[in-house]
Amino acid sequence: MSDKNSSQKNWTSWHHLLHKEILGNKTLIPDGANLLIAVSGGQDSMALLNLINDMKTQHNWFVNVWHGDHQWHKKSAKYALELKSYCNKKNISFFFDQANKNNISSEEKARDWRYKKLSERANQLLIENQKEIDIYLLTGHTNTDNAETFLLNLARGSNYAGLSNINKKRLLKHHIFLIRPLLIFSREDTKKFCQLQNIPIWEDPTNCDLTIKRNIVRKEIIPILETMYPGCSKRINSFAEKMSNYKNEQNDLSKLASLYCEDAIGVKRELLNSLCIEARCTILNTFLKKDCTKQLSSKNLTHLASSILVKDRGKIDLPDGFEIVWNKDYINLEKN
């Protein structure tokens, strides 16, 4: 029996489901890929680590682990050492970074720090390989995380783009991709998998801190909704997926509409102004994204579209040193 066939002998239904997902999307995690898995020690990331490590022979993957210590609780350094020992026993390369907790006092700052350090480690792997390869950063996001994010963004007043699914794959920078393979699983799935496989878990005590907004959604709001409407998390996740499809559809249609409104001189003002405010905002956003890296908020886009409608000529300063200028006939983007 070949190594590849024998490696499947002890696979669970979760292994086979993830394997099917990867085979169905060859570009998600290609065979022979260099992987850097972000592992916190919680059930989701530990499930991801073990699933990927069990499947690495099948796909000829090179597996590395990165762990970030936020120093948010007294045992964090101890957890990091224990996780390193766990990886060493499995012959998995382990990378570790420790934050200054005073510099990551919020969820957003902590997330930015994690992705910054992950990218630095990925760059290190690129340099060490001394050849042009891709690095795949893997995180343990599940569809339960997706439902939580949807509710948080809905409460913040996000537009339809903000209510879309978490992307399975996106390019972070040249040769570095962010991959979320576990979006086909729920948090209940990762819990059962870890229990069945006797996988150790290092639970972060801050996950129970109800001053953190996501924890309130996770520990209080979703359980109440599940009691009222059993299975609501799956339906929320399904709706977020539909919103992703809607976003993709809108992006494609807005590109066509933008081309229709443009010629070699610029965007035709009269044609743009003949459309509803929502369509004008969408087309202006598509037009601006060609050069402006920083996207305008919905509020600023609405203000811009309204100004272009009521004034025959004018200009408004934009991020990145640009300004949008218009006269009676045309709208253009210029560098200050």
UniProtKB/Swiss-Prot annotation:
GO terms for cellular component: cytoplasm. One of its GO terms (molecular function) is tRNA(Ile)-lysidine synthase activity. Its EC number is 6.3.4.19. It is found in: Cytoplasm. The keyword Nucleotide-binding applies. Keywords: ATP-binding, Cytoplasm, Ligase, Nucleotide-binding, tRNA processing. Pfam families: ATP_bind_3 (PF01171). It catalyses: cytidine(34) in tRNA(Ile2) + L-lysine + ATP = lysidine(34) in tRNA(Ile2) + AMP + diphosphate + H(+). It comes from the Bacteria. One of its GO terms (biological process) is tRNA modification. It is an enzyme of class 6 (ligase). ATP binds at residues 40-45. Belongs to the tRNA(Ile)-lysidine synthase family. PANTHER family: TRNA(ILE)-LYSIDINE SYNTHASE-RELATED (PTHR43033:SF1). Ligates lysine onto the cytidine present at position 34 of the AUA codon-specific tRNA(Ile) that contains the anticodon CAU, in an ATP-dependent manner. Cytidine is converted to lysidine, thus changing the amino acid specificity of the tRNA from methionine to isoleucine. The N-terminal region contains the highly conserved SGGXDS motif, predicted to be a P-loop motif involved in ATP binding. NCBIfam families: lysidine_TilS_N (TIGR02432). This is tRNA(Ile)-lysidine synthase. It comes from Prochlorococcus marinus subsp. pastoris (strain CCMP1986 / NIES-2087 / MED4).
